[in-house]
Amino acid sequence: MKHILLITGAGKGIGRAIALEFARAARHHPDFEPVLVLSSRTAADLEKISLECRAEGALTDTITADISDMADVRRLTTHIVERYGHIDCLVNNAGVGRFGALSDLTEEDFDYTMNTNLKGTFFLTQALFALMERQHSGHIFFITSVAATKAFRHSSIYCMSKFGQRGLVETMRLYARKCNVRITDVQPGAVYTPMWGKVDDEMQALMMMPEDIAAPVVQAYLQPSRTVVEEIILRPTSGDIQDD
């Protein structure tokens, strides 16, 4: 059975790992035929991950989009509706961050972070949940962060955006439970992704890898539709990496 899955931020990091994990899952689940709709700001990244997923036997569809741009959100939504007519899974993974001391952060840092993490995530979810509500099925993942429930000194704007996402998650559950839609909040701690920039070997050794997040996401999706994994919290074994 074909499953239409949209993954935002699929070109790098956690999104890329989730796409590959879904592609590989079909080997062990004969009734699961993923159609991976992969979205990212960078076409070259999408082309690469698309080829990797196809090598695993999955069908792929790529669309370059920046979810901080409302025109791109509308285009992405229209693409799903017109090409497929339904959607089984939305992985809200696209996210950005600007970090620094409170006094150093700017209005541009604020807008850059909020436009993707909150505005884009909200309006994409709003549009595609309407489709799930009509079809009375679906699953939405929010890749938030441990920073959705815990503050970090040099992450004030990022924490605000993630606390906000957490509010959206809880609100969506109130709607989703009435129409058989599953909502899963995934809260990773430190994961070695491009968002961290250059880190030394000692710090990298303390961090999780994107694959560590991808496997539980796919496992949660493949649960029977009568069951929802509401929250997945993953941290490095050594705990959170502090920024003070």
Curated annotation (Swiss-Prot):
The keyword NADP applies. The keyword Oxidoreductase applies. One of its GO terms (molecular function) is oxidoreductase activity. Substrate binds at F99, S145, Y158, W196. One of its GO terms (cellular component) is cytoplasm. Its EC number is 1.1.1.325. NADP(+) binds at residues 9-15, 40-42, 66-67, 93, 116, 158, 162, 191-196. Catalyzes the final reductions in tetra-hydrobiopterin biosynthesis to form 5,6,7,8-tetrahydrobiopterin. This is Sepiapterin reductase. It comes from Chlorobaculum tepidum (strain ATCC 49652 / DSM 12025 / NBRC 103806 / TLS).
